[in-house]
Amino acid sequence: MHIVIIDNYDSFTYNLAHLVKSLGVQVTVLRNDRFALEELEAFDKILLSPGPGIPSEAGLLLDVIRTYAGRKPMLGVCLGHQAIGEMFGARLETLSDVFHGVATEGNQSGVDPIFQGLPERIVMGRYHSWVVSRDGLPDCLEITAESDAGQIMALRHREFDIHGIQFHPESVLTPDGAAILRNWLNLTK
């Protein structure tokens, strides 16, 4: 399997790439503004990395989702997760408290196979100041994990093989991060 990681100019991207490679997968990293959309045809899956700012400021990030939704499996992490939400009609909202290097607990619903084999209670390493809003969440998106404060920590598209996680699976603050990535890599829809 060969996956592409769309690098949204984030220092965590290569930690994510290293973890995915350690799971036995070939990885190519492309900066979000340094490729042609057609180049992604060569890859089996697309991983949308964390990054600063908001999705509309992240190069071709939204175009990748628009072009490959329903054609390629995708996983969005942090900014990538927010971009998935926004692309399908969700709103983003700023948090009153910024999370940077904070581990919080929450629940995963058990419906998303990326959480297969994990307990209902999970610990998530968080590095963000925005979340996908619950208000007006479109029907095509399903919440699959939330923080104890009720913030969306994971979602999936009901029709397409697209998953998003707000937290960082590559962080030491996410004990089950490798298992989540392994589950996603092993998914075939």
Roles of regions detected by a PLM:
Residues 17-26:
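Two-component/phosphorelay signaling modules centered on CheY-like receiver
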Residues 73-75, 91, 123, 142, ...:
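Proline-centered loop/turn at the N-terminus of a beta-strand
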Residues 172-189:
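Acyltransferase
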Residues 43-117, 181-183:
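Cysteine-nucleophile active-site neighborhood
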Residues 112-159:
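Catalytic beta-strand/loop cores that center a nucleophilic Ser/Cys/Thr
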Residues 26-34:
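A short beta-strand-loop structural module common to alpha/beta enzyme folds
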Residues 1-4:
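Extreme N-terminal starter segment of soluble prokaryotic enzymes
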Residues 34-43:
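Short amphipathic alpha-helix with an adjacent loop that forms part of the alpha/beta core around
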